[in-house]
Amino acid sequence: MQRRHVFTFQSRFVPMIINGDKHSTIRLPRTRVVAVGDIMDLRTWSGVPYRSKQTKLREVVCTEIHEITIREIYVFVSGRTLSYDEVAQLATSEGFRGIADMMLWFFANHSLPMTGTLYRWKS
């Protein structure tokens, strides 16, 4: 049975979601488990988070789920260490200007090391 899960995004990531350039998101573990095939309802806040309405950006189907660990100098996806080029590609696909931008964002928002889930979808 397909379940629906809401994912909210900061405004900096919205243009990439709307135009279809962003096909993944990295999140802390969720209480309600997402499965491949589930619907991901991608949204953003219209104003102040939790004090405004949510705006629906896209509705997509989850195609891949991987455990991800982001450390100060390494990134592991499903237990495999990513190469420098793979980390650079991940950072860009996640909407960051590069590896340093991604690492700073995760350090500021979650602290490092951070273990979570990488969700992927197709446009």
PLM regions and their residue ranges:
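Catalytic phosphate/metal-binding cores of nucleic-acid and nucleotide-processing enzymes, i.e., regions
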Residues: 1-123
